[in-house]
A protein has these predicted regions:
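Short aromatic-glycine-(Arg/Gly/Cys) micro-motifs in beta-strand/loop hairpins
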Residues: 2-44
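Low-complexity intrinsically disordered segments
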Residues: 47-70
Length: 70
């Protein structure tokens, strides 16, 4: 995998965002890679790679109506 961590972001059609931090191993197991995108009936899914958890938290601080799910 290209990055150490990945951020799974579900942009719900109601206007909220649910985000989950994944290790590279977990992202790979889910079939994700950097810039992965998919549309479903309930949300748009985006996956972006990051080198650190701190970088993910910095990115998340700019998102509106975002909930970090563990």
């Amino acid at each position: 995998m290209e990055y150490n961590f990945y951020l799974e972001q579900k942009y719900l059609y109601g206007g909220r965002v649910e985000a989950r931090i994944l290790t590279a191993a977990r992202a790979e197991a889910l079939g994700y890679e950097d810039d992965y995108r998919r549309n479903t009936a309930n949300y748009r899914l985006y996956v972006d790679g990051f080198n650190s958890v701190e970088a993910i938290h910095s990115y998340l601080s700019d998102l509106v109506n975002c909930t970090l799910v563990e």
